[in-house]
């Protein structure tokens, strides 16, 4: 939620993978639980693609929707209990589905901190078009800023997983 749109055209890289991984953890605790993952464009980077396959094998239901037809959520009472009714057009089935959910979890975009511009000004470092900190040179100096003595690592640079952050920290 909140990326790969006009406001933020980048992929947060961690949202889809964590949604799938959390679905697997829920299935581990209760194999009979119904889990739906609604997505516009599933992107499970690296070995996280294995999580996607495993989740599919464990009957996690993946529903793709088009950006023009986003899911709608309403609080309703069904069978005497409050639920969240999620209405989503299924692009593959060509029909609109209604899912009554007890819980709803959003995989939110990784966005730069509101103080990023202020920090960039203090350290005299540059930002990329998405307002993440920009390295001096993507190939030759990937953890350096143009300003000397200041180094770059982790999601301040761009959305990334922890192993990528650790690798970047080693320089």
Identify the residue ranges that each predicted region occupies.
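Residues forming the flavin
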Residues: 1-171
């Amino acid at each position: 939620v909140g990326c790969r749109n006009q406001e933020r055209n980048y992929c947060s890289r961690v949202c889809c993978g964590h949604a799938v991984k959390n679905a697997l953890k829920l299935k581990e605790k209760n194999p009979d639980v119904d889990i739906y993952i609604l997505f516009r464009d599933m992107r499970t980077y690296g070995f996280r693609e294995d999580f996607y396959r495993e989740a599919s094998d464990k009957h996690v239901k993946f529903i793709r929707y088009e950006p023009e037809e986003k899911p709608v959520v309403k609080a309703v009472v069904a069978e005497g209990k409050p639920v969240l009714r999620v209405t989503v057009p299924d692009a593959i089935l060509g029909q609109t589905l209604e899912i009554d959910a007890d819980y709803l979890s959003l995989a939110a975009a990784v966005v730069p901190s509101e103080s990023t511009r202020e920090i960039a000004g203090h350290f005299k470092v540059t930002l990329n078009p998405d307002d993440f900190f920009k390295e001096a040179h993507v190939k030759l100096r990937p953890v350096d800023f143009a300003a000397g003595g200041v180094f770059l690592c982790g999601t301040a640079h761009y959305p990334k997983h922890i192993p990528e952050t650790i690798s970047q920290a080693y320089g």
